[in-house]
Structures are given as structure tokens and as C-alpha cells.
Design a protein with these regions (language model features):
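Active-site nucleotide/adenylate-binding loops and adjacent lid/helix of ATP-dependent enzymes
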Residues: 1-6, 41-44, 90-176, 180-181, ...
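Short glycine-rich anion-binding loops that position phosphate/pyrophosphate groups of nucleotides
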Residues: 11, 55-57, 139-141
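ATP-dependent carboxylate activation and anion-phosphoryl transfer catalytic cores
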Residues: 234-322
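Preference for protein termini
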Residues: 1-31, 41-51, 66, 107-109, ...
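Glycine/Thr-rich phosphate-binding loops of Rossmann-like dinucleotide-binding domains
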Residues: 13, 59-61, 144
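Phosphate-binding site of ATP-dependent enzymes
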Residues: 154-236, 240-243, 264-271
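Conserved N-proximal alpha/beta basic substrate-recognition cap immediately N-terminal to
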Residues: 25-118
Length: 322
């Protein structure tokens, strides 16, 4: 199978070669204009499937600013040409936390309650509906952006201080109940043989450094700080996590694959923090993310993962044209 890897990174910074050794593949670092370049790739006839890992790109150099693009442009171009591609489609590409929360509530899936707020005054009113402790995050909270140890607030004064900081930097803040307890990840992937019944990988538990209880900028990107993941092997907990992840994946209508971040309180109740329809994959061993670990927990590893998402890409291509 001939695979085109669509990325916004250069091969020096992101090299999927160790994972794709069983395929004939080429990596294309996309720059704008995206639609024209994807059309040219399609018309070349060189590829059978497109492995899309683009997150969008903004060039810092003003001279290259016109080369930047939004990641949704890549998906839109792939869909417009009805090409077989992996990952999220335009229906579920970048949902807000509030959209996730609404869908979870409507489907009886536990979700960390919260609000998007745009000012200290708004936060002061809405915080009355939340239970402490409270976490103040970037409104989209990707990559732990803008999160620090002080992002956990135990008093109203702390909440308002953090809301002011985050809103001033990002224009809004996600203010939500912090679930004291353990944190887990659940990876759910399309089952091409039964698209309504996705496959769920063995979940992972996050093992935080001593004195830490959640991911934040100071520890997430410092590879000198000991941080680990552990496969969940307790049968009952494993089944509960897989079931909640699967239900959230289905309720959100995720295509391809998605990673749920889940907290468990002292009562054993599960609360999803988010479902990421574009989780990082194929990272280098020293930088493995949760999706990499969970894929490798499975006996078929990345071979099984690629088999599922490539077959799903063709299946969804047929569904779009039906």
C-alpha cells in the first residue's frame, strides 16, 4: 500500500519511518495553498491512502506568513476530492469542551462540569454552580497550554486570579470542576468491519511525579522529569474505562480514532475531561504520548492500528460517496 503522510512538520522533527517500514510511503510537509497541493498529490496517482497528522501551521517569520494554514483546511480538501484519509473528518475535527460536555450529558456519560468564561465578572457568577477545587484552563486546553500548578484553585480568590490571567492571554478560559483522583487515557479506533462498534485499546493510567496531580506545562514538556504511563490491568476498571471511552466516541460521532482523558474520583466514578479526535501518534520512544503506549499495549501494535485506520479510510470514502 502506498501511503502519503500529510504533516505540518519536517522529517528532521517528525520521522515516522520506524512505524511505516511495512509500507511504501512518502511524507509531505504541507504549506499553503493546501487545497491545490492536495489536489496535485491526488492527481499524481502515487498514493493509495493519506495518513493525515496535520495540526495546522503558523510560520513565525512574517515573510513566510502566507504559507500558514488551519488544519481543518486539510480535511476539507481531502473530503472535497473524496480521498481515503485517516483521522477526524470535518464533522468532529475540533469540538469545544462545551460541545463535548453537552453531548456527554445528553448521553449519560460522566463529564467534568464547567463553563467557558470571558471575564472575571462572568466567572464570579458561574463559579457558584461548580464544586471546589476548580481548574482554570485554556478555552481549548490543548497540550496543557497555559496550565500551571496554580491552575488548580481552592478558593474564589484563586479562581478569579487564574481566570484573569488566562482570559487576558487567550481571550477566554475554561473553568471546570477538578476531579481529585487518578487520571487515565482511553484510545478508541474505528472498526472497519463494523463501523458502529469501534475497537478500544487497553487503557493507560498516568503516573504523575511526586507532588503532582495533573499535567501542566512545567512537567509535560520537561523530559528530565520522571513521568510514566501504566497499562490498566484490573479487569473491572479496564472494562469501565473502555466502555466510557467507547460511548463518548460514539456519541461524538468521531471518525478514525480518538483519545479520551478521564479522571476517577475516590468513589470510583469516571469523568471525561475531553475526547481528542487528533491525538499525537508515532512519536519517538523518548517522547511517547499516551496513544503510542496504548497502541503498543495491544498484541498487534502499530501494525494492527494501521490496518484498522487504513481500512476505515476506504470504508468511510465509500460511505461519503453513497
Amino acid at each position: 500500500m502506498r501511503v502519503c503522510v500529510l504533516s505540518d512538520e519536517y522529517i528532521e522533527d517528525f520521522n515516522p519511518a520506524p512505524y511505516l517500514k511495512d509500507y511504501d510511503w512518502k511524507m509531505v510537509t504541507l504549506t499553503a495553498p493546501v487545497a491545490e497541493k492536495i489536489r496535485a498529490l491526488a492527481e499524481s496517482g502515487d498514493f493509495d491512502v493519506f495518513l493525515n497528522v496535520c495540526e495546522g501551521y503558523e510560520f513565525e517569520d512574517e515573510e513566510d506568513e502566507e504559507l500558514g494554514y488551519e488544519a481543518i483546511e486539510v480535511v476539507a480538501a481531502l473530503e472535497a476530492l473524496n480521498l481515503p484519509f485517516t483521522g477526524a473528518d470535518s464533522r468532529c475535527f475540533d469540538p469545544t469542551r462545551e460541545e463535548m460536555q453537552s453531548v456527554a450529558d445528553a448521553n449519560g456519560v460522566g463529564f467534568a462540569k464547567g463553563y467557558r468564561v470571558y471575564s472575571v465578572e462572568e466567572a464570579e457568577q458561574l463559579v457558584k454552580n461548580l464544586r471546589f477545587p476548580i481548574m482554570i484552563k485554556h478555552p481549548k486546553s490543548y497540550g496543557s497550554t497555559g496550565m500551571f500548578k496554580d491552575s488548580r484553585a481552592d478558593t474564589l480568590e484563586q479562581v478569579l486570579t487564574q481566570v484573569k490571567r488566562v482570559c487576558s492571554e487567550f481571550g477566554a478560559a475554561r473553568m471546570e470542576e477538578f476531579i481529585v483522583g487518578k487520571e487515565f487515557n482511553v484510545l478508541v479506533v474505528d472498526n472497519p468491519d463494523d463501523i458502529e462498534n469501534p475497537f478500544v485499546y487497553p487503557p493507560a493510567e498516568l503516573i504523575f511525579p511526586v507532588g503532582e496531580e495533573f499535567w501542566h506545562t512545567d512537567i509535560k514538556w520537561d523530559y528530565n522529569i520522571p513521568f510514566d504511563f501504566k497499562e490498566v490491568t484490573d479487569p473491572e476498571l479496564k472494562a469501565k474505562l473502555q466502555n466510557e471511552g467507547k460511548r463518548m466516541f460514539q456519541a461524538m460521532g468521531i471518525a478514525g480514532y480518538g483519545r479520551c482523558d478521564v479522571r476517577m474520583n475516590e468513589k470510583g466514578e469516571l469523568f471525561i475531561l475531553e475526547i481528542n479526535p487528533n491525538p499525537a501518534i508515532m512519536l519517538s520512544p523518548k517522547e511517547y504520548g499516551p496513544a503510542d503506549y496504548m497502541i503498543l499495549y495491544d498484541k498487534d501494535g502499530y501494525k494492527g492500528f494501521f490496518d484498522r485506520i487504513f481500512k476505515s479510510a476506504f470504508r468511510r470514502q465509500k460511505m461519503r460517496s453513497a
